[in-house]
């Protein structure tokens, strides 16, 4: 009888743990505003929606490191583009949706810093910037507090690095970042 009661408590504990971890794995949705250069002498405020379905795991980054070192850059880019961590969606961007291929959440004193990585793409239909082949990625940086509010930056032309700590970091950037403000966790 004691074994049944103990096993029942163990199953209840496991079920509670799994349900709480499932709640932690729910998608996060952020909204933000960005000042975007439009036609000459004008600037528009655009709203952006960012949905993060999951964050990059150590195993995924380790796999990318292995592919890069053993099979080369093109295979690395294929493996990188195969990862789907969420969507960067400019509202009113004429149907443009950019898939996020890498995502990290780094705890800070007041909240966390979220880094999102994708291959370089034009997300603003009104802009056609010059590109540099050395900076083939786009990085979105969100700095949010415990309540999910904060600021951020979009680095449209960035280079990335895979670290031995199994993370992806921005190595440098070519053009000045666009400032995000009114960043809010909406879901």
Give the role of each language-model region.
Residues 1-4:
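Positively charged n-region of N-terminal signal peptides that target proteins for export
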Residues 8-20:
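Bacterial N-terminal signal peptides
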Residues 22-27:
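Boundary at the C-terminal end of the N-terminal hydrophobic targeting segment
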Residues 28-187:
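Long, low-hydrophobicity ectodomains and other hydrophilic envelope-associated domains
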């Amino acid at each position: 009888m004691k074994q049944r009661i103990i096993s029942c408590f163990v199953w209840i504990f496991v079920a509670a743990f799994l349900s709480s971890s499932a709640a932690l794995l729910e998608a996060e949705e952020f909204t933000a505003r960005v000042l975007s250069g439009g036609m000459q002498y004008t600037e528009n405020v655009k709203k952006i929606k960012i949905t993060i379905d999951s964050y990059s795991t150590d195993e995924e980054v380790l796999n990318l490191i292995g592919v890069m070192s053993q099979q080369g850059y093109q295979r690395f880019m294929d493996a990188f583009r195969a990862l789907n961590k969420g969507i960067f969606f400019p509202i009113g961007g004429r149907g443009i949706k950019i898939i996020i291929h890498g995502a990290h959440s780094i705890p800070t004193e007041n909240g966390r810093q979220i880094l999102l990585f994708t291959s370089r793409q034009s997300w603003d239909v009104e802009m056609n910037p010059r590109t540099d082949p050395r900076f083939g990625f786009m990085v979105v940086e969100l700095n949010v507090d415990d309540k999910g509010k904060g600021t951020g930056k979009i680095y449209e032309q960035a280079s990335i690095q895979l670290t031995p700590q199994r993370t992806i970091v921005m190595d440098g950037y070519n053009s000045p970042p666009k400032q995000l403000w009114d960043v809010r966790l909406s879901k």
